[in-house]
Swiss-Prot record:
It holds the Pfam family Ras. A motif (Effector region) lies at residues 41-49. Keywords: Cell membrane, GTP-binding, Lipoprotein, Membrane, Nucleotide-binding, Prenylation. Gene3D superfamilies: P-loop containing nucleotide triphosphate hydrolases (3.40.50.300). This is Ras-related protein Rab11A. Belongs to the small GTPase superfamily. Rab family.
């Protein structure tokens, strides 16, 4: 989902955080949106939601971030929240091998529900616990090469690469939407009659750019 409201932000992008329960998604979200970290963070029940506004190449982008429950019993509920998402951060815990082994299951689920243009970044969380690492760097590099994903390691505790992960995915989303808007303008211009003005409306399931003085 991408909306434009002139007086608040230029674009609104919906994102989802996915991965097994306990990998640290909620702490990543609280670190990014409130710069907070809780050692006793509890597992998400259903879906949590937060926003943060930041600059992407001179544009004001509001990230609407949905933190989905990792437990299997909530899958039917949270899968509905994939709808309209243009970005996904998929997390595993570098100290728990099973969370890494489940990454491909999460990718299958995401691809079953995703928009075709969704941007996906894989993140190995809890990099502050490298002495307990259960996933080798060779394993994660092999997976990202196989799946064609961007990758980085994060730590909500140390605030390592948290902002970078979101900045990277929001920039990638912005590039995709900008290219689609430009392509639509060029297509419309090529079909316009000589001497006539052209009005361009860009709209699809993943990007809906609006102009006006309204607010949401």
């Amino acid at each position: 989902m991408a909306n434009r409201v002139d007086h608040e932000y230029d674009y609104l992008f919906k994102m989802v955080l996915i991965g097994d329960s306990g990998v640290g998604k909620s702490n990543i979200l609280s670190r990014f949106t409130r710069n907070e970290f809780c050692l006793e963070s509890k597992s998400t029940i259903g879906v949590e939601f937060a926003t943060r506004t930041l600059q992407v190449e001179g544009k004001t982008v509001k990230a609407q971030i949905w933190d989905t429950a990792g437990q299997e019993r909530y899958r039917a509920i949270t899968s509905a929240y994939y709808r309209g998402a243009v970005g996904a951060l998929l997390f595993y815990d570098i100290t728990k091998r099973q969370t890494f082994d489940n990454v491909q299951r999460w990718l299958r689920e995401l691809r079953d529900h995703r928009d075709s243009n969704i941007v996906i970044i894989l993140a190995g969380n809890k990099s502050d616990l490298k002495h307990l690492r259960a996933v080798s760097e060779q394993d994660d590099q092999a997976l990202v090469k196989k799946e064609g994903l961007s990758f980085l390691e994060t730590s909500a505790l140390e605030a390592l690469n948290v902002d970078k992960a979101f900045q990277t995915i929001l920039t990638d989303i912005y590039h995709i939407i900008s290219k689609k808007a430009l392509a639509a303008q060029e297509a419309a211009a090529s079909t316009a009659l000589p001497g006539q003005g052209t009005t361009i409306n860009v709209s699809d399931n993943s990007a809906n750019v609006k102009r006006g003085c309204c607010s949401t």
